[in-house]
From Swiss-Prot:
This is Taurine import ATP-binding protein TauB. It is a peripheral membrane protein. It comes from the Bacteria. SUPFAM superfamilies: P-loop containing nucleoside triphosphate hydrolases. The gene is tauB. One of its GO terms (molecular function) is ATP binding. The lineage of its organism: Bacteria, Pseudomonadati, Pseudomonadota, Gammaproteobacteria, Enterobacterales. It is found in: Cell inner membrane.
């Protein structure tokens, strides 16, 4: 379980997050949504251990987070892949740094590549892949170390609409298969409503938790309902419009 209590953080000397209290249970998919500058990425960087926080606590499985760790896998919007390595070696890179024996890490990489639908592309280089394929590699690399928690920072923001829909459904299937705790940062309202088991709305900076919404659309998808059916459901449309109105309210209030 991820537990965040009374978290305060600065960015560039200015308050970025204020009194953040969140819990992410095992097997849940928490989505954090908010306007630009609300501290979404700062929150993910704090949980990943990339930057320090000033007050409060962040705990994963009862242990305080003080820096990066293998129990947290991170997927970035720009992938962060190594262009001089092929797909297989990119996926295996973290395992190599951890000292995993070569044959074992290559076998794990092969299984992860297969899991994200890139079987047969193991020897391709990153520059030979589409944007969606590169994000699949990023997800496979993050999962290769078998982390407790998967963190994703707007991973589909640069993709076209069709590819983005494919990647959303892939991530939900992986979430169901692995049972991982997942925290997704996004600015896309429809994506947030579709994918979250709990949606957290942040106010403009300094970011505060404005509202927490339990949702069941992701569970409906992994239970077998199509994404098209879900997104055309009046309940889904009503929730999407409600969240949109809340985001616009905050923009108006702080403009």
């Amino acid at each position: 379980m991820l537990q965040i209590s009374h978290l305060y953080a600065d960015y560039g000397g200015k308050p970025a997050l204020e009194d953040i209290n969140l819990t992410l249970e095992s097997g849940e998919l928490l989505v954090v949504l908010g306007p630009s500058g609300c501290g979404k990425t700062t929150l993910l960087n704090l949980i990943a251990g990339f930057v320090p926080y000033q007050h409060g606590s962040i705990q994963l499985a009862g242990k305080g987070i003080q820096g990066p760790g293998a129990e947290r896998g991170v997927v970035f919007q720009n992938e962060g892949l190594l262009p001089w390595r092929n797909v297989q070696d990119n996926v295996a890179f973290g395992l190599q740094l951890a000292g995993v024996e070569k044959m074992q890490r290559l076998e794990i990489a092969h299984q992860m590549v297969k899991k994200v639908g890139l079987e047969g592309a193991e020897k391709r280089y990153i520059w030979q892949l589409s944007g969606g394929q590169r994000q699949r590699v990023g997800i496979a690399r993050a999962l290769a170390a078998n982390p407790q928690l998967l963190l994703l920072d707007e991973p589909f923001g640069a993709l076209d609409a069709f590819t983005r829909d494919q990647m959303q459904t892939l991530l939900l299937k992986l979430w169901q298969e692995t049972g991982k705790q997942v925290l997704l940062i996004t600015h896309d309202i429809e994506e947030a409503v579709f994918m979250a088991t709990e949606l957290v709305l942040l106010s403009p900076g300094p970011g505060r938790v404005l509202e927490r919404l339990p949702l069941n659309f992701a569970r409906r998808f992994v239970a077998g309902e199509s994404s098209r059916s879900i997104k055309s459901d009046p309940q889904f449309i009503a929730m999407r419009e409600y969240v949109l109105s809340r985001v616009f309210e905050q923009r108006e209030a702080f403009s």
